Every structure is written in C-alpha cells, then in structure tokens.
C-alpha cells in the first residue's frame, strides 16, 4: 500500500530529533493521564523496515507489582510514574541485548527491573514493544490506513486476526483499546476498564498533541528559571489539559501563516539544542539503541502476507486459514494523496467512524472485505525471548543457544544433588533417633554424644555378658547330665530304674503312671547360686529364673515384672530340693520397649531381697 509521503517524512523527523522524542514522551504521558488509562504507545514507520509500523515510544500508567528505586532521593508521584516507564524501556533493551547479541548481558544497576518484578499489565506493555504492523493490519494498521480512530471494547474477546494481542490482553485484563492517527503515526491507548466509545475522550487524549509544546519567552525571569530547572531535571509536570485553549492556539498559528510557523520551529530547535549536555545524553542513548538493532538479524517482512498470525514452531504456532491477497492499493493511495493536499499544515479535527467493535461486527466486516493480513513480529528473537520469560523458560538467566541449555542442565543436576543430599541427611537423622531410643540414658542429643554413649553402652553389655557366662559355667556343667533314681513297684518287687535326664529339657514320665504329661524342667544347682536369663524377640520376652526358694519370692518376681510393664502370657515353675526354677513368657504392654539388661537387673534385685 502506498503511504502518504508527508506522514512518513513527519515520522522520520520525529525519530531523528532527540528533543522531539523527549517532548513525545511528555505528550504520551499527558494523553494517558488525561483520561486515566493504563498505557500509551506510539507507532511510527520504521527506518529498517520501510512501510511497517513499529513501536517508537510509550508511557505506562497502570498497576505496579514491584517498585524499585535506584537512589535514596524522594520522588514525586509524577516522577515515579515516569521512572516506571523508563525502567520498563530499560528492561526491554536489556532483554534485546541479552538474546540478540548472544553475549552476556552487561551489569545493570541495582534499581533495574527483572522479569519477575513485572505484573500482567506490565508484561503486556513490554511484549507489545516487539510487534510490528503493516497498514491495514491490526488496530494500529487499520487506524493508520483509514486515517481515523479505531475503538475496541472487550479486547479480550476479540479474534486473533483483527487483534493479534488478544491472548495477552486477556491475561492482562485489558478491556478497551483506542488507536488514533497523530503526527505521522498512531497513538494507542489501553485500559483495564470497559469504556464505551465517546468523542470527548478522543479529543482529550489528543489535546496534548495539538497544543503547542515549544517554550515561549516568559515575561518574568522566574518563569524562565523554572523552565530551565525542569529541563535540567528531566521530569515533566502534568498539568490540567484544556482542549479549547489548545484549539485556539492552533487557529492562531494557522492564521499567522507558513512563514510564522517556520520561524517558530527554528526558534524551538535552537532552544532545544542550547542544552548540550541533555542533547548529548539523549543522542548517545538513541545511538546505542539503534546500534543494538543494527547488530541483530533484522529481516524484512515478507510481502505476500497470509491471513492469520504465523509464528514458527517454537513460539506457540497458531494455524492459519487460507491465504488471501491484500486489497488493491490504488484507491487508498489516491485518497491519501488527496487528503494530504487538502489538509492544513497543523492537523485539526478529524472525521470519526463510530462503529461498534464486537465479535459479530468483526466477522461481518471480514466477510465483506478481505481479512487484514496477519501481523508478523518485527524482531523474532526478542519476542521469542519474551515469550520464554513469560512461560518461565529461564531465558533471562541464559544468553541463548547451547550456553543456555548447558546452564539449564547444570542447574537441574545441582537441584537433584541437593535433593538427594537432603534425603540422605533425613535418613541419617532417623537412624540416630532410633539409636538414641535404645540407650538407657543419654546426657546430650547431638550425633557425637549418641555415638560415644552407644560405644560405651556396648562395652558395658559385653562386660556383663562375660560375667554372666563365667558365673554360669560351674552350675551348668554338673547339670548337663544328671543321674536320678526313680523307684516304682513292679510285680511285687522293687525295681530300681536308672534314668539320665538332661537339665533344662522337657520329658514325658510314664514311669509315674501318667502318660503324655509335660513336666517343668529339672534343675540341679548348687546352693547359694542364682541365674537370670532374659531373651527378647520383638515384643515377646522369655524370662528364666533359677535361685534358692524363699517365701514371697514369687510375689517379688511378679511385682518386678509388673513394674516393667510386661503382660504375662504363661508361667512354668518348679521347686525341687529347695531350688526354684521359673520360666515366664511375657509381652510388652505398650509401644515402648525395655532394654533387656534393665529387666535382668530388676529380677536380680527381686530375688536378692531378704
């Protein structure tokens, strides 16, 4: 489509003047704040891609998730708002430099924003910077081609063909969008509220662009000092906009003639160039930005555009419908040339087209005319980067390519190592707790103390086992095989039967006249000896006591067993020749277990009492 020569030239002049860019930022801020909308973007013709509308500048006026202040100086509300827009612009440039150059991103100030500091609306604002439109594509392209404003309500419900950022708008809760052609480009305004179309809002939003912004000679020196201080500070004071006064000034400028306008423009340029420090700083920033853009692989958009938003496989591919040719440009170009010829040097009021922008009307309009061609991002690499950051792909930490993949793999390996180490430590702690529960007493609960107490306790147990074995040797030897005489009458004669009995074993005694009768173990112990054996298996406990018979001995033994919280299951007892043999099967009553040596000590105390 042939573009208006005057509008393209006006946009190029705007991009080439740093002072005009600073003025543009203040105008965008005034436009967004005058109607209290969330953001303002300015789209103009790109130098690297002729005939394509790209992002030029913007102002953010929406919600802030995380605010970072680089210095300790207290800022006003206006300065904080302007600082947020600058921080978002710096973050966008940092993302470009980190992915486009394939180099490590330079060190950034402490007050700079990171991707995790942005909210949904701020992400929508930053990602919108990566888009580009041909005339007739999307909302900015339609407004630029028709030279009329376009109002979109319920933006989150619009189709991706007419509004490619519909998905982003839905996540950011953007409801209403307004695009107005101004100063050779397109002004885009957006808000999270549903605002019906109103002509007065359009007039208020564009009033800052029609009002003369050049500084005039002040009758008092104090006014000049204030203006110079404001210029040095780099901030803008947002005043109440008066559209009627602005239109009066425009009419006065038009009546003054072309010569007066040219003279005033020269004065404005001379005064803007007077501040050398500010000019050099702004020029340096712009040159750095364009040098980054030149280093990146910027490919021209293909001329035969398709109907639908096409992104390659790594960027959320959306299938396209059948391609349709773009509308013939002859009539539109002729109309634009005729409109430029009849237009005044300063833009005045424009004819509006109040068309209800809904889903049904969009489909009907697309059925009449050829659907607008899909928008293709001007810079694919930055947009892919931003989408990876939105999806949590970790692109901010990596510089792209194999380096990013290696860093991601190393990060995953480190995370797995940390998790395995944490599980190992938890298992060790559990084992130390079990070991601590087996000790009878412990003074400290740290790992070194538990190990030391365990070693000492094992040595003590080993010593006691040796003592028990040494004390049982003289009593067990004569009792292993004992000869007893059992006398019974047999056919009138007394017959002596010699029987060998193993100590501690069970036997049947048909000699006593009762078959299959189980007898308690036969004990043979020396006088004055006693023996206690404790066997623990899970919750089952086997107690064997051998000692001299005394009165109340059984009572003391069972009192000791009761004090140890043992439930008695079975008892076998015998008391031949003044010695008592006791075999008790018991079970732990509660969940806790008693150490065997504690049971042995309690039984020894019970049988040792007099």
Curated annotation (Swiss-Prot):
**Location of the region described as Disordered in the Swiss-Prot/TrEMBL record:** 402-422, 468-524
The portions of this protein that span the membrane are none
GO terms under cellular component: nucleus
What is its subcellular localisation? Nucleus
- Offer one Pfam family short name for this entry: bHLH-MYC_N
Q: Check the record and name the InterPro entries matching this protein.
A: bHLH-TF_ACT-like_plant, bHLH_dom, HLH_DNA-bd_sf, MYC/MYB_N
Q: Name one GO molecular function term.
A: protein dimerization activity
Q: Does the keyword Transcription regulation apply?
A: yes
Alphabetically, which GO biological process terms does the record hold? Answer: regulation of biosynthetic process; regulation of primary metabolic process
Which PROSITE patterns does the record associate with it?
Answer: BHLH (PS50888)
What family does this chain come from, according to its entry?
Belongs to the bHLH protein family.
Q: What is this protein called?
A: Anthocyanin regulatory Lc protein
């Amino acid at each position: 489509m042939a573009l208006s020569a005057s509008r393209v030239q006006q946009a190029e002049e705007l991009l080439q003047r740093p002072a005009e860019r600073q003025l543009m930022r203040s105008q965008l801020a005034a436009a967004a704040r005058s109607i209290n909308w969330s953001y303002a973007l300015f789209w103009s013709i790109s130098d690297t891609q002729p005939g394509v509308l790209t992002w030029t500048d913007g102002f953010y006026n929406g919600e802030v998730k995380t605010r970072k202040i680089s210095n300790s100086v207290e800022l006003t509300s206006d300065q904080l708002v302007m600082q947020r827009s600058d921080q978002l612009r710096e973050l966008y440039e940092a993302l470009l430099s980190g992915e486009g150059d394939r180099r490590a991103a330079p060190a950034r100030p402490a007050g700079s924003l990171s991707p995790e500091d942005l909210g949904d609306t701020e992400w929508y604002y930053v990602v919108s910077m990566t888009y580009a439109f041909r005339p007739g594509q999307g909302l900015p392209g339609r407004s630029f081609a028709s030279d009329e404003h376009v109002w979109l309500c319920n933006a989150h419900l619009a189709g991706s063909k007419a509004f490619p950022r519909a998905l982003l708008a839905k996540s950011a809760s953007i409801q209403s969008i307004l695009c107005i052609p101004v100063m050779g480009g397109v002004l885009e305004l957006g808000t999270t509220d549903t605002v019906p179309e109103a002509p007065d809002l359009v007039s208020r939003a564009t009033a800052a662009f029609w009002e003369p912004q050049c500084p005039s000679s002040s009758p008092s020196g104090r006014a000049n000092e204030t203006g110079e201080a404001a210029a040095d500070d780099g901030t803008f004071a947002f005043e109440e906009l008066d559209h009627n006064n602005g239109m009066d000034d425009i009419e006065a400028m038009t009546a003054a003639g072309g010569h007066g306008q040219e003279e005033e423009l020269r004065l404005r340029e001379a005064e803007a160039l007077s501040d050398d420090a500010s000019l050099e700083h702004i020029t340096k920033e712009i040159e750095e930005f364009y040098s980054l853009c030149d280093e990146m692989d910027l490919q021209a958009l293909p001329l035969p555009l398709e109907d639908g938003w096409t992104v390659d496989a790594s960027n959320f591919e959306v299938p396209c419908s059948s391609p349709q040719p773009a509308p013939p440009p002859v009539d539109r170009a002729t109309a634009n040339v005729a409109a430029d010829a009849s237009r005044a040097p300063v833009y005045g009021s424009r004819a509006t087209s109040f068309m209800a922008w809904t889903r049904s009307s969009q489909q009907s309009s697309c059925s009449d005319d050829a659907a607008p061609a899909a928008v293709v991002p001007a810079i694919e690499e930055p947009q892919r980067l931003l989408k990876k950051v939105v999806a949590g792909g970790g692109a901010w930490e990596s510089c792209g390519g194999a380096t990013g993949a290696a860093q991601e793999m190393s990060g995953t390996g480190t995370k797995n190592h940390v998790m395995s180490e944490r599980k190992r430590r938890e298992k060790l702690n559990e084992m130390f707790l079990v070991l601590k529960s087996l000790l009878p007493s412990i003074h400290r609960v740290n790992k070194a103390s538990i190990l030391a107490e365990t070693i000492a306790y094992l040595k003590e147990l080993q010593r006691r086992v040796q003592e028990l074995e040494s004390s049982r040797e003289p009593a067990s030897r004569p009792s292993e095989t004992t000869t007893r005489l059992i006398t019974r009458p047999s056919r009138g004669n007394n017959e002596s039967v010699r029987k060998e009995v193993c100590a501690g074993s069970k036997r049947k005694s048909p000699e006593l006249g009762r078959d299959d009768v189980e007898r308690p173990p036969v004990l043979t112990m020396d006088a004055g000896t006693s023996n206690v054996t404790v066997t623990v298996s899970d919750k089952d406990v086997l107690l064997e006591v051998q000692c001299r018979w005394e009165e109340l001995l059984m009572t003391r033994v069972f009192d000791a067993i009761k004090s140890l919280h043992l439930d008695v299951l079975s008892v076998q007892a015998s008391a031949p020749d003044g010695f008592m043999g006791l075999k008790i099967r018991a079970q732990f009553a509660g969940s806790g277990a008693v150490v065997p040596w504690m049971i042995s000590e309690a039984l020894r105390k019970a049988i040792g009492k007099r």
